[in-house]
Amino acid sequence: PGFADVTVVDLPDAVLRGDEPEPFDADTELRRVAVHAVGDKPLPHGVGATVRYAPGSPQARCLEDRQGVLEPVLAGRGPEPGGHSLITVPLRARGATLGVVAFHRCERPEPFEDDDLSLAQELAARAAICVDNARRFTREHTTALTLQRSLLPRGRPDQSAVEAAYRYLPAQAGVGGDWFDVIPLSGARVALVVGDVVGHGLHAAATMGRLRTAVHNFCALDLSPEDLLTHLDDLVARLDHGEGWAAENAPDSGIVGATCLFAVYDPVSRRCTLTRAGHPLPAVAGPDGTVEFVDLPSGPPLGLGGMPFETTELELAEGSSLVLYTDGLIEDRNRDIDAGLERLRRVLARPGRAPEEICEAVLDAMLPSRPSDDVALLVARTRVLGPDQVAEWDLPADPAVVSRARTAATGRLAAWGLDDLAFTTELVVSELVTNAIRHAAGPVRLRLLRDRALICEVSDGAATSPRLRRARNEDEGGRGLFLVARLTDRWGTRHTADGKIIWTEQRLPSR
């Protein structure tokens, strides 16, 4: 008020989006972002209005010449009603012109002088640095948000084990490193993952992308939950010590840290195996409305190294909802974790809702309009593969049983209406059962699952995995597994506490 009666700030939309401003010309449209007037003086253009400056006007000359313009006496030509003296100064920072600020005198009789122009230029220079910092933050925030959204799941994977819904909300302070995933596994199982990388911005989003990719790769190897977290822990430790991307692109980003919760659900046994690395406890909402927070060993956050991860196994009723989330859902500056968990329990206690409805109810009840920390939420309602979709046989370690196994398998395929897959399945059963009897010890089990694909599994007590190779012309064996791999859509090995399982998948014929 002691300097000007009216002050206005105009910026191009590109600056408001965080982009580099284009060169200014007569057609450049600006957005009025700030107005301050002494008293109740009416103004023709308020905040949010678009303005264009006439060629030759003080503002236009200011932007073209990138110099402050002093108009001591306007003689009624001022852009604001009643203005008689004007100073316009470009907002320049780091070599770029970001906009213009105009100071008007309407009520004060004294015109602006050269000393006033110097003061206005000093004020504008300081303000321009703040505007450019905000522009750069907006650009980084937008880039990080775009990167994170591109790294998060875009759709629901093709699996039958759970009905899933999820949400991600960025933080008010900036994009963080929260992520979630639903990953189909062999044997009709599914992996559910939620994680949280420490920090905000591009570094957190990029680190999240690396960890999410690593989890997918480890899942493809059919690692156990505790082994998967051990490998992920080692990866975070290497990032923390500045290997690869971290050393080249984020030398001053600080310590890399992350938490993670990893669960595997089997729709045949209804068993769910969970492990966590410093992550909040998951909740299980039963179909009857009961809610429990799973008592999981905490495990250290990822990156500390040297500590084993422990698992907990649950049997879930069909229709149970497994709720995984990051700490931003239950904790903020005004609420401790216990209060957040109790509120979450109350929200989940209402039965009969689909996962999408649960997500909406949880976010509405738990979060303000703009959370201080980013939030990832994953809700998975369990399904079950019924007895009519599963067939299994325990086989003695006798080569004579192979033909009986083939007959049993083709008979079950006929009952399922899958005769088109009988020939390939006979070959798969013959090869896998024969190898198990020949090379493994202990009992052999054959299992067929009719899910979105026909799954054939043969388990035995040996820990060694078969190796796919191309047999030489003089070799008497070694071709069976190669044929299995060529005739089926997918195959692999997963280890169990008692040995291993060799599995194959075939697409079901279209109806």
For each of these PLM feature ranges, what is it?
Residues 31-80:
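Regulatory sensory and allosteric helical modules in signal-transduction proteins
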Residues 143-165, 205-300, 309, 313, ...:
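Catalytic core of PPM/PP2C metal-dependent serine/threonine phosphatase domains
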Residues 84-92:
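A short, aliphatic-rich beta-strand micro-motif
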Residues 437-511:
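Conserved beta-strand-loop-beta-strand hairpin that lines the nucleotide-binding pocket
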Residues 113, 175-246, 250-254, 323, ...:
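Primarily the active-site beta-strand->alpha-helix module of PP2C/PPM metal-dependent phosphatases
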Residues 201-222, 298, 316, 320-366, ...:
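Active-site-proximal, acidic helix/loop segment immediately C-terminal to a metal-coordinating Asp/Glu
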Residues 2-51:
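GAF sensory/regulatory domain recognition
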Residues 173-177, 257-260, 292-334, 443-447:
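Acidic loop->beta-strand submotif enriched in PP2C/PPM serine/threonine phosphatases
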